[in-house]
Each structure stands twice: as C-alpha cells, then as structure tokens.
Amino acid sequence: MGQKVHPNGMRLGIIKSWHSTWYANNKNFSNNLNNDFEVRKFLLGQLSKALVSRIIIERPAKSIRVTIYTARPGVIIGRKGEDIEKLREKVSKISGVPTKLNISEIRKPELEAKLLADNIASQLERRVIFRRAIKRVVQSAMRLGAKGIKVEVSGRLSGAEIARTEWYREGRVPLHTFRADIDYSLSEAHTSYGVVGVKVWVFKGEILDKVLFHIDKSKDSLINDFSKKKRKSRV
C-alpha cells in the first residue's frame, strides 16, 4: 500500500499537517477551497524564481494568513519590504479579506522534495543528461543529512522514440512506516520531445522515536507495578 498511495496524504494527522488549516460550513467550504487554489496558483506564478517549497494558508476570524516557505526570502521581501507589501495587496484582492503574509526561510533547500524535483525538471529542460541531473541532486541531498532519497523520471528520456521510466535510489526510503518523515513531490519538465515527469521522495528520519519509546516504557512500568502488587497479595 505504501508504494502506491501518496506519501504526504497517508501521513496527514500522524506526523504531517494540512497545507490549509481552517473550518467552514457547507455554504462557504467550496468558496474557501477555490480561493485557496487561486491564491496558491498566483503566488507560485509570481514567485517562480524564489524557490518556494510550500504555502500554508490559515483563516482566522474573517482574514487570511499565508505562510510562504522559501529558500530565497530576499527575493520575495525586496528592498525595504516593498515587494512583499505589493504582493500582500494582490493576495488580499484575490481572497477578498484582510491578508497577512509570513515568510519562512528554508535552511536546507537540498532536503526539500519540491525544490529538488523542480531543479531536476529545469536541468532536463536545459538538455542536461537525466542521469547526471539525478546524481547531482542525490549526492547533494545525502551530503546534507538525508537518510535516503529516491528519484523517478518517466517520458521520452534523452529523446528516445519509446517512453520509459527510470529511477535511482540511495539510502533508505521506508514508505510503509508511518513515523518516517518522507517528503514527496512531483514536477514536470516540458522538453522539445514532450513532457517528462519527475518524482522525488526524501527520507529525513523518524519523528516519533522518542514518543514511542516513552509509551513502551510506561507500559512496561505498569506491567511491573501490577506484577508486584500481585506478588504482595499472595504473600
């Protein structure tokens, strides 16, 4: 199952959170959902050079709060915050409510699946050999602390007549393990031979190790206490 299902969707509510966090009644739900789609589409189009990994949207009390995770915060903010203010006004027009923009810097962009997939796609569009592009990305990710990475490309690779799929993996990528922090993303390279799909899985480590150990330890202590009481009662 873990091999087929979306890695991020399978872990929602366990170790991952939603990208849109708000509540709405039946009347407003579809409008808010469509509004989130339009806001994300606009921001990703405007900030294509800012290396945006993900956009989190919250809706507190008739307003909207947008958090942009980017590897280049200076590109978004601009001189003295001029660019971000213009961006906030445009997002406010799209959403129709007061808007607050937060910028969060990504310290290690080499471990973000979205940025890695976009990087490979851009190299393929520049006619870089796909094996070379994949190895560059994999080596940089493993060097900066990734526990494992898997990259899959599919399409008319290197202009071949018949489309095929090739993948490369280094390290561990445990897709069946819920506590495994796996970042997944998909991108497309539009080449002269057609569209080439790029999928990236990045395993960053296990999140719930300490919590699970604590729970197991407490269970053992409860069993030990129960066995001690039982022995005393027999005596």
UniProtKB/Swiss-Prot annotation:
Gene3D superfamilies named among the record's database cross-references: 3.30.300.20, Ribosomal protein S3, C-terminal domain (3.30.1140.32)
Pfam short name (any one): Ribosomal_S3_C
Domain (KH type-2): residue spans on this chain: 39-107
GO MF assignments: mRNA binding; rRNA binding; structural constituent of ribosome
Transmembrane segments: none
Keywords: Ribonucleoprotein, Ribosomal protein, RNA-binding, rRNA-binding
Domain of life from the UniProt record: Bacteria
GO cellular component: cytosolic small ribosomal subunit
Matching PROSITE patterns: KH_TYPE_2, RIBOSOMAL_S3
GO BP annotation list: translation
InterPro entries listed in its UniProt record: KH_dom, KH_dom-like_a/b, KH_dom_type_2, KH_sf_prok-type, Ribosomal_S3_C_sf, Ribosomal_uS3_bac-typ, Ribosomal_uS3_C, Ribosomal_uS3_CS
Function: Binds the lower part of the 30S subunit head. Binds mRNA in the 70S ribosome, positioning it for translation.
Entry's family note: Belongs to the universal ribosomal protein uS3 family.
HAMAP family: Ribosomal_uS3_B
Xref: NCBIfam families: rpsC_bact
PANTHER family: 30S/40S RIBOSOMAL PROTEIN S3, SMALL RIBOSOMAL SUBUNIT PROTEIN US3C
Subunit structure of this chain's protein: Part of the 30S ribosomal subunit. Forms a tight complex with proteins S10 and S14.
Protein name in the entry: Small ribosomal subunit protein uS3
